[in-house]
Amino acid sequence: VCTALNGSGGWPLTVIMTPEQQPFFVSTYLPRESSGGRMGLRELLLTVADKWRGSRAELTKTAGEITAWLRQKTAPAAEVELSALTKAAEAQLEESYDEEYGGFGTAPKFPSAHNLIFLMEYAQLKNEKKPRQMVENTLRQMYKGGIYDHIGGGFARYSTDREWLAPHFEKTLYDNALLALAYTEAWQDGHMALWRTVAEDTLDYCLRELKAPGGGFFCGQDADSGGDEGAYYLFTPDEVKQVLGDEGGHFCECYDITPEGNFHGKSIPNLLLNTRWAFLPEGYD
């Protein structure tokens, strides 16, 4: 909808619709408050509420026209076989697949759990090896990288590099819910203990950090902490040794925590180096 109306899309997506689910406003990210000549979400919602009360018929008419135009714009030119569509989708993902580090494309690189779930189900349906290999390598590389929180569990929004090392440190509920599902389905498919471990740790993170006291869940955690982006997730060897004592050295070697650091002078814990101290659950290769 956003791409069709505005020429481009993105996430988060802001769509305002009628009760009949017909859109009349669509945008990507909007700040909470208005600033720099850009309307914020709070002001927008108040403006739309006033407009809805005073000119509901006009908004409903506009929404209907947009919906009719979108249906015409997106109508298939001809009947297409479902098997042909799924094969085309698999081929497109295979074309953009990163053989070395998993995932799709270069950088920034998103987990794209929905693509992984599709490929797993496609592999099961068609009994093909390549889609399953793409999924397993991607799940493994994401777990090893800094996009995965090796201490608190859960995944960051995306990686700023191809190797999954340096994430944008925001954590979102929907990403982690979908990734927990992807790792769970991978465990059900191959019974590799690592997939179950990651799924459980991710769900534990959601229940511990994102569950609201009054019920429901928060949508995520901001990337900023301690005044800087990712400060909560960065460590020095001295900080680790203050907590772990003599075991701190082993931890630092395992998780690539060094004096020079790998991110602005500090270290993002990761298992990309495959050191001898690395904790690798049963079934990891």
Label the predicted regions.
Residues V1-D285:
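Replace the tail clause
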